[in-house]
C-alpha cells in the first residue's frame, strides 16, 4: 500500500501536504477558471468562503457591512465567495426572488444554519417546497387569520393588563411582545398556548432556546456536519458546546409532547378539532387525507412547528418593539397616531379588526416603517435559478449560481427611502397620495413564491398590537437608545452592538 511503510508522523505530514495541494489548486481554480471569475469583487472574497467565514464567525456576523463596502467600490453586482453573487438593486429584487412562474431553488447555505431540515423553510428544491407550502398556505390566508383575531385580542387584553399592573415600574417591552407573539403563534399551530404572557418578567424557555440557536447560526453554517447531528448529541456534550444548548432540546421535547397529545386523542375529538372554525395548522394537516403520509412523520411535523413558531416569535416581537420605541421617542408621532385612531374609535366591548386599521393611512405608515426598520431576516437568503441564465447590468449569470440581495441594504437605500434611518410614517401616506407603489420595495418579508408564510399573521399582530398598546398605555422610554434597536450583527436575525437589544419603558398607567 502507498502509506503502509510510513511512520505515523510521516503519514500525517503526507495528509497535510495533500490537503495543502488541494487548497492551492482550489484557490487557482476559483481565481482563474471558475465561471464567476470575471465578476467584480475583491479577489480575497473569491477564494472559497474564507473571507465570509472571517467576518461572519470570527467577527460575529458582520459580513453584511463588508458586502456593502464591496458595492460602494465595485458596483451593484459583486462576487462575495467562490460560488455566489450579491446584487444591490431594489428594482431587481423580484427577479431574484421570483414568483411561481419561474423555478427557483434555495441555496444550501441559506438553511445550513438551521436545525430543522424537514421544514418547508429548509426545503431546497422548488417543486417539493411548492407541495409543502400548499399544505399550510390555506391556514395563513387573510380569511384564516381573521378567524384568529379573537385570540390575538384576548392575548392583548392579558398583556395590557399585566403591563398596567406594572405602573410605576420598568418593563422589558421586547420580552413582553415576545411572550405575546409566542402565545398567538403556538395557538395557531397547535390549537393551544402556554400563557407565556403570564411568565415571570415575560421570560420563558422557548425564547431562550431560540437565542441559543441564533447565537450558533453563523458557526453552524460552516460546520462540515449537519446541525441536526449536533442537536442529537447527548445532553452533557451539548452542554460543553454551549451551556444553554439543552434548552433547545427541552423546547423540542415540549413541542413533541404537544404533537403526541393530539395523536393520542380519540378520532371523534380529532374530527371536532378539524371542523372547528379556528383550527390549528398541525391538526388540520394531520387530519387531511390529501396530505401524503411522508409529510406526516413526527420529525416533519416537529420541524415545521418549530420553524413557524420560532420565525413568528422574534421577528414580530422585534418589529413591535421597534414601533413602540419610535412612538415613545417621538411624542408628535404618537399623538398623531392616537388622533387618527380616534376616527375609528370603538364603543365598549368592541375591538378593531386588522382590515379597519389597515384603512387608516397613518396607522399603515407606522406599521410599514416599523417593518422596514426591523428588517426581518437580515441574513442573505440566496436563490438559484437551476436552468435559466439571469441577465443583469451586462452580465450573464450562469444557471445554478446562488444570487442574493439584502433586506437591510434595500430598506436603507436612500434612492427609495430618503433619510432611511428616520422613522417617518408620512412617507407611506404621501406615496399613496401620489400613486407611488412604495410597497414594491418592502422586502422584509422577502418576495416571490418563498416569501414569508406568516405575513398575514404578522400583519394582524402588528396592527392590533401597535394600535391597542399605543392607545391603552401611557409609558416613557427607560435607558433605551437607538443603539439598542440598531443592527450591528447578523445571526439569522438582527442583533445590537451589545446586550439583547431590549426596549425598556416605565409604565405611568392606563391612558385617560
UniProtKB/Swiss-Prot annotation:
Heme binds at residue 452. Its cofactor is heme. The gene is pbrB. It is an enzyme of class 1 (oxidoreductase). Belongs to the cytochrome P450 family. Pfam families: p450. The fungal sesquiterpenoid aspterric acid (AA) is a submicromolar inhibitor of dihydroxy-acid dehydratase (DHAD) in plants and is effective as an herbicide in spray applications. It comes from Penicillium brasilianum. Pathway: Secondary metabolite biosynthesis; terpenoid biosynthesis. This is Cytochrome P450 monooxygenase pbrB. One of its GO terms (biological process) is mycotoxin biosynthetic process. Its EC number is 1.-.-.-. The chain crosses the membrane at residues 6-29. It is a single-pass membrane protein.
Amino acid at each position: 500500500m502507498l502509506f503502509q511503510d510510513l511512520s505515523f508522523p510521516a503519514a500525517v505530514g503526507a495528509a497535510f501536504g495533500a490537503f495543502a495541494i488541494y487548497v492551492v489548486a482550489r484557490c487557482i481554480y476559483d481565481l482563474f477558471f471558475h465561471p464567476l471569475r470575471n465578476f467584480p469583487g475583491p479577489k480575497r472574497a473569491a477564494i472559497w468562503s474564507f473571507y465570509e467565514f472571517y467576518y461572519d464567525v470570527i467577527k460575529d456576523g458582520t459580513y453584511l457591512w463588508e458586502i456593502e463596502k464591496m458595492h460602494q467600490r465595485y458596483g451593484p453586482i459583486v462576487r462575495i465567495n467562490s460560488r455566489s453573487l450579491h446584487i444591490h438593486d431594489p428594482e431587481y429584487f423580484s427577479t431574484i426572488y421570483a414568483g411561481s412562474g419561474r423555478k427557483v431553488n434555495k441555496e444550501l447555505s441559506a438553511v445550513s444554519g438551521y436545525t430543522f431540515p424537514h421544514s418547508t423553510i429548509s426545503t431546497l428544491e422548488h417543486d417539493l417546497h411548492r407541495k409543502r407550502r400548499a399544505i399550510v398556505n390555506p391556514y395563513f390566508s387573510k380569511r384564516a387569520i381573521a378567524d384568529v383575531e379573537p385570540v390575538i385580542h384576548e392575548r392583548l387584553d392579558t398583556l395590557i393588563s399585566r403591563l398596567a399592573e406594572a405602573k410605576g415600574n420598568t418593563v422589558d417591552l421586547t420580552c413582553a411582545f415576545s411572550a405575546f407573539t409566542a402565545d398567538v403563534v403556538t395557538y395557531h399551530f397547535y390549537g393551544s398556548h402556554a400563557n407565556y404572557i403570564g411568565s415571570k418578567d415575560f421570560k420563558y424557555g422557548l425564547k431562550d432556546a431560540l437565542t441559543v440557536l441564533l447565537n450558533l447560526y453563523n458557526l453552524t453554517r460552516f460546520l462540515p456536519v449537519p446541525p441536526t447531528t449536533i442537536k442529537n448529541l447527548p445532553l452533557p456534550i451539548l452542554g460543553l458546546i454551549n451551556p444553554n444548548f439543552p434548552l433547545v432540546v427541552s423546547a423540542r421535547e415540549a413541542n413533541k409532547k404537544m404533537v403526541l397529545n393530539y395523536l393520542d386523542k380519540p378520532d371523534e375529538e380529532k374530527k371536532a378539532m378539524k371542523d372547528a372554525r379556528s383550527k390549528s395548522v398541525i391538526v388540520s394537516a394531520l387530519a387531511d387525507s390529501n396530505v401524503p403520509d411522508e409529510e406526516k412523520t413526527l420529525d416533519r411535523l416537529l420541524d415545521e412547528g418549530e420553524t413557524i413558531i420560532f420565525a413568528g416569535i422574534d421577528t414580530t416581537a422585534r418589529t413591535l418593539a421597534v414601533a413602540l420605541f419610535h412612538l415613545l421617542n417621538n411624542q408628535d408621532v404618537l399623538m398623531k397616531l392616537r388622533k387618527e385612531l380616534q376616527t375609528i374609535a370603538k364603543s365598549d366591548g368592541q375591538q378593531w379588526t386588522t382590515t379597519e386599521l389597515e384603512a387608516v393611512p397613518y396607522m399603515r405608515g407606522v406599521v410599514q416603517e416599523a417593518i422596514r426598520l426591523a428588517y426581518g431576516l437580515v441574513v442573505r437568503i440566496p436563490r438559484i435559478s437551476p436552468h435559466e441564465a439571469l441577465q443583469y447590468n451586462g452580465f450573464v449569470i450562469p444557471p445554478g449560481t446562488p444570487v442574493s440581495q439584502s433586506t437591510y441594504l434595500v430598506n436603507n437605500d436612500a434612492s427609495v427611502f430618503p433619510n432611511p434611518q428616520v422613522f417617518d410614517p408620512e412617507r407611506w401616506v404621501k406615496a399613496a397620495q401620489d400613486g407611488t407603489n412604495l410597497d414594491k420595495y418592502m422586502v422584509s418579508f422577502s418576495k416571490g413564491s418563498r416569501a414569508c408564510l406568516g405575513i398575514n399573521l404578522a400583519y394582524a399582530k402588528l396592527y392590533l398590537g401597535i394600535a391597542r398598546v399605543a392607545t391603552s398605555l401611557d409609558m416613557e422610554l427607560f435607558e433605551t437608545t437607538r443603539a439598542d434597536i440598531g443592527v450591528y450583527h447578523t445571526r439569522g436575525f438582527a442583533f445590537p452592538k451589545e446586550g439583547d437589544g431590549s426596549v425598556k419603558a416605565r409604565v405611568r398607567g392606563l391612558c385617560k
